[in-house]
């Protein structure tokens, strides 16, 4: 199952491209049906399943490639959906501040997640990282039921936002 590091792109590039291409249908559905929060919840569940499967199904390159594709679909949809929700929920005058706080906490989360993931992997093995991620996703999934679909802005195309 070993793939030399110089060939990792053989797996990652197709997974990233597939994830990018397949993120469009859920995003379009969420916008057209005013179901962005529903799509977000679905993708949180989608990633939870992916993390659990990562803990068990990393025996072949094909399994890894498939799971990476699943991961990147969920990740890309959430990466587009979350700032969208923040900008819709925040008052117009505070939208820039809200997005700044979002981006700052996102970067803090990258650091903390990387540090915790490394410590967990070192002490309990790589499978434990996936289980901890799945558990965190379940907490996020449960807490997402407090969210309501934000109102769609009522403005004409090309109208200046005030």
What do the predicted segments below correspond to?
Residues 22-36, 121:
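Helix-to-loop junctions at the C-terminal end of transmembrane segments
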Residues 133-162:
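Multi-pass alpha-helical transporter architecture, strongest
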Residues 77-90:
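Intracellular juxtamembrane helix-capping segments at the cytosolic ends
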Residues 56-67:
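Helix-loop junctions at membrane interfaces in 12-TM secondary transporters
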Residues 2-18:
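Loop-to-transmembrane helix entry
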Residues 5, 92-102:
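Loop-to-transmembrane helix entry/capping segments in MFS-fold secondary transporters
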Residues 38-53:
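Structural signature of the two symmetry-related core transmembrane helices
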Residues 119-137:
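A membrane-interface helix-boundary motif in multi-pass transporters
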């Amino acid at each position: 199952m070993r793939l030399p590091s110089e060939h990792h792109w053989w797996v990652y590039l197709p997974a990233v491209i597939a994830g990018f291409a397949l993120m469009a249908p859920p995003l379009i559905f969420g916008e057209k049906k005013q179901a962005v929060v529903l799509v977000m919840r679905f993708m949180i569940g989608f990633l939870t399943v992916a993390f659990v499967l990562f803990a068990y199904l990393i025996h072949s390159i094909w399994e890894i490639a498939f799971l990476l594709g699943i991961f990147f679909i969920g990740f890309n949809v959430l990466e587009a959906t979350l700032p969208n929700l923040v900008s819709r929920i925040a008052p117009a005058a505070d939208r820039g501040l809200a997005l700044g706080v979002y981006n700052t906490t996102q970067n803090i989360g990258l650091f903390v997640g990387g540090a915790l993931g490394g410590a967990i992997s070192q002490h309990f093995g790589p499978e434990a990282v996936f289980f901890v991620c799945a558990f965190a996703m379940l907490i996020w999934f449960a807490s997402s039921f407090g969210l309501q679909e934000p109102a769609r802005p009522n403005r004409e195309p090309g109208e200046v936002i005030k």
